[in-house]
Amino acid sequence: MSRLATRFEKLQSQQRKALVSYVMAGDPQPQVTVPLLHKMVAAGVDVIELGLPFSDPMADGPVIALAAERALAAGTNTLDALNMVKEFREQDQETPVVLMGYLNPVEVIGYEKFVSYAKQCGVDGLLLVDLPPEESKEFGAILKQHDMDQIFLLAPTSTDQRIQHVANQASGFIYYVSLKGVTGAATLDTSEAAARIEKIKGMTNVPVGVGFGISDAASAKAMGSVADAVIVGSAFVKSFATLAADEAVEQTVNKVKELRAALDELV
């Protein structure tokens, strides 16, 4: 059983919700990332989503786009991000790590070479924002050969046909985008999201996580009440735009504790 399946099964047996945290690899400096991941896990993160820095992150709002700029300016590339997972695995063999990024850097390395090395480093799954399920047959087959999960996005605008298509292909978890727009958007319609998540869960046994717009205890609880996981990115990443690295790490860890406590109130 994969690390993701094991983690979700354990949480479901405890009637707890998964907290999935997004971190941009190499932001603000490469040496910050791995210690930050360990601290976030200790504070209550269940699954890590590690962003691959890319120069044209079209699905990301300004917070994460700027994080990618900082990481690239600090010299972080795709292979560096994979090596961060490898270093993380020296101390943590249990916490699932999913890479989130864009197709171009993966194509530059080559599908087989990238996936093979990612697996070797301890990566559990991959979400490529600009690779829709209709075009992912070749890449998905390579992931399957290496026992890695392929995670897809669904949105408020997704048709029933698209939902079913993703439900048939996805593994690990499905990422439901709770807002129309880019990451870090401000307003969250919990009732609409709840209805859509119920619909998705009616079509698949794959866990459903919800992200975009979750930034505090109230929104985490609202989404956690209907989804298997809440996915938080911009609320963590934004600290690194304005604070010194050590202060930003401390603020991020405190935010993890706040969200973890909120989700655990749902038990």
Swiss-Prot record:
Subunit structure: Tetramer of two alpha and two beta chains.
UniProt KW keywords: Amino-acid biosynthesis, Aromatic amino acid biosynthesis, Lyase, Tryptophan biosynthesis
Name of the protein: Tryptophan synthase alpha chain
Reaction(s) catalysed (UniProt annotation): (1S,2R)-1-C-(indol-3-yl)glycerol 3-phosphate + L-serine = D-glyceraldehyde 3-phosphate + L-tryptophan + H2O
Function: The alpha subunit is responsible for the aldol cleavage of indoleglycerol phosphate to indole and glyceraldehyde 3-phosphate.
Active site: 49, 60
One MF annotation (Gene Ontology) recorded for this entry: tryptophan synthase activity
Family under the similarity heading: Belongs to the TrpA family.
Cellular component aspect of the GO annotation: cytosol
PANTHER family membership: TRYPTOPHAN SYNTHASE ALPHA CHAIN, CHLOROPLASTIC, TRYPTOPHAN SYNTHASE, ALPHA CHAIN
CDD domains from the UniProt entry: Tryptophan_synthase_alpha
Phylogenetic placement of the source organism: Bacteria, Pseudomonadati, Pseudomonadota, Gammaproteobacteria, Moraxellales
InterPro entries for the chain: Aldolase_TIM (IPR013785), RibuloseP-bd_barrel (IPR011060), Trp_synthase_alpha_AS (IPR018204), Trp_synthase_suA (IPR002028)
Listed EC numbers: 4.2.1.20
NCBIfam families: trpA
HAMAP family found in the cross-reference section: Trp_synth_alpha (MF_00131)
Ion transport found in the keyword field: no
Pathway membership, UniProt: Amino-acid biosynthesis; L-tryptophan biosynthesis; L-tryptophan from chorismate: step 5/5
Domain of life according to the entry: Bacteria
Pfam families: Trp_syntA
